[in-house]
Amino acid sequence: MAFNISTQLNKEQRAAVTCGKGVNIVYSGAGTGKTTIISQRFAYLFNQKRINPSNILALTYTRKAASEMKQRILELLPEKYHKDVNIYTFHSFCSRFLREEGQKNFVIDDDLSNFLKDFLKESELKSQKVLQIIDGFKNAYFDFDTNSLKDDERLVELCEFHLDPQERNFQLFKETAIAAFVEYEKGKQQNNKIDFADLLIKTCTLLSKDHKLLRKWSKKFQYILGDEFQDTNQIQYELIKMLASHHQNLFLVGDNNQMIYRWRGAVSDIIDSLKSDFKVRPENEFYITQNYRCDQNILTVANSILGTIYAKENQPDSTKGFLFSAIKSNRLPVYFQASSVEGQHSWIINKIKNLHKNHGIQYKDMAILFRTNRNMDSMTEALEADGSIPLKQNKGFFKQLETFKKVLVALITRSNYDIKLALKSLRVWPNVLNKSLTVNEQVNLDKILQNLEQAIFLDEHTRGELTEAAKVFTRLIKFVEEQQFEALLAFTFEALNTDQFVCNFIFRTLQKLQTENKNFTITDFINELRFQQDELKQSKDNVINLITVHSAKGLEFEAVFIYGINQDNFPLKSKNQIIDLQRELDELRLFYVALTRAKKYLFLLSVYQMSGEIIYPSKFIRFINKEDRLEIATINHKVHQDDEFFDSSKTEDYQKKYLTENTDFVNGDSVSHRTYGKGVVVEVREDAVCVAFKNSKYGQRWIVKNHRDLVKAVY
């Protein structure tokens, strides 16, 4: 596909794409075309500098981003060079490196919380929370020279970052988290497992200790291109430095204003480290500020948040990062303060319907963004109760996929731990084995299940219970040994009662491997399944998107609702917690990311009260000049359920629709509504009731208690 750099890139982009050798840093703001810049840089090196694609390495963070980048680059290269293109996530590159260098016998496990569950049984810490702490620590502070973690103080700091104030007040919690790390690493080693952080650690350790290996790989890649550089953690930076050590040609694209992953090890001064390590000159820094995604009115709001960030950081020449757009309309972003959480739900639901019905916006092109996952549940319940807006249903899919992988992992490792998980999933695990394993830690389940007569320490009754489990396990082993993969899948699917959609995905993955590599192993199959999960999480169905702001990074939508912009929620803060400047800047950057996901419509929402207590809007709202930059949707703190409310041509006084006193309702009350008809109260909250209407067309709806149209009835 022909692409003319001189006409199809703007001046800023063109200067970056055609820069010379050495280390070049491109500060590319939200929606300014990062993927375009990297793909065009790749094509420029091939077409103008005659660099073979096999000698260029492009690194990014997600499979989705890598896939999009690869597609763009392949369109710009002759077909005969397609097989030579090297575009990877950090993890997939490390997986390739380890396998090429003889490190083949490992299983990547992205759900290792079970190792911690027993250990933390007596603690109030959750295993997933400890895993976050461990992952951030490993990614940030591994010392390759000593092959050890650098200091306990950093682990304690990460505990401070992730734990609630009540947890942080007790030294016991910190000690538990540190001890859990030791237990976690021991469990992985005993079961021949590695996590994604280990891929990076093993790769960097090998490169740092084997100079011939380092020379081989650093000579191979003449140019290295990096995406989203602001999210780089210490270990990823060390890998980039080593790979670039011979040619020292780096082209790194990122945006410091979108650095939102400090909690998982991203280093805030990584750009400064890069400049110092490679002696980067000012002429090798490029700023890309023309946005191709958002309406200018949305960018005006986003720039006001950037201005706040720059002021708090005392940045000189701070306007360099401000974005501008050629997309202009008379449509302002909207701020709405609902009277309650239920009112917020109602307003969002009605607005989604209005955008879909009257403006032709598909549900898949709208997103509700949340600061945390816990905010999502009540909104999901409200959407389910309404029933008219399609929702993404992915939880069951991924749970079934994880269960299937547990069975396959057991067939590779043959460890007691994995066999137990697999047989429990297959519902053939005899409970008597729990006691047997505790009494005799030398028990080898693999041998017992394949040769029951050797289980002399078990009585006849116990051996009888094992028979069914043994039949299942030995049959699975036979499938693996004889490489009957289709039979293995069919048998496992039937035993697990796997949904057809999950089966189809797994079969497609198997067929892909069979086409690409006839000598693939079951380990390759498992790892490929793990690597492809990111792609599945981006459903193509026409459903509304409910995601956290962190998950929304890199995405864009026609309409965006930012949920719950209230004090203590955004910025996120626990009771009695004091937010320091660095934490506030992290939250401001996250808010900026949320704002810049919207292309046309942006809605900022907060609530007036929750559980009977008045709560204040986030100070982030105050950082925006509302009179000039926001349309204020309402100030009367009432739940608006009328479709007409969203039509600016209507001038009715909505305050007249509400009584001055709340009506007392209890569950089971019979009620009547002027529009929806007869119904029964099924839930009562502070200022609203949920009514199940007899007319199935209306289903269950939340209505403010003192709405004039809602009255008690006897019938």
Swiss-Prot record:
Q: Which domain of life is it from?
A: Bacteria
Q: Where does ATP bind?
A: 31-36, 293
Q: Chloroplast: present as a keyword of the record?
A: no
Start and end residues of each UvrD-like helicase ATP-binding domain: 7-295
Look up keyword Chaperone and say if it applies.
no
Q: Record's InterPro entries? A: DExx_box_DNA_helicase_dom_sf, DNA_helicase_UvrD-like_C, DNA_helicase_UvrD/REP, P-loop_NTPase, UvrD-like_ATP-bd
Q: Which UniProt keywords apply?
A: ATP-binding, DNA damage, DNA repair, DNA replication, DNA-binding, Helicase, Hydrolase, Isomerase, Nucleotide-binding
Molecular function GO labels: 3'-5' DNA helicase activity; ATP binding; ATP hydrolysis activity; DNA binding
Reaction(s) catalysed by this chain, per the record, are: Couples ATP hydrolysis with the unwinding of duplex DNA by translocating in the 3'-5' direction; ATP + H2O = ADP + phosphate + H(+)
Biological process (GO), any one: recombinational repair
For this record, the Gene Ontology CC terms, alphabetical, are:
cytosol; DNA helicase complex
- Please give one Pfam family short name: UvrD_C
Among PANTHER family, the record links this protein to: ATP-DEPENDENT DNA HELICASE SRS2, UVRD / RECB / PCRA DNA HELICASE FAMILY MEMBER
Its recorded name reads Probable DNA helicase II homolog
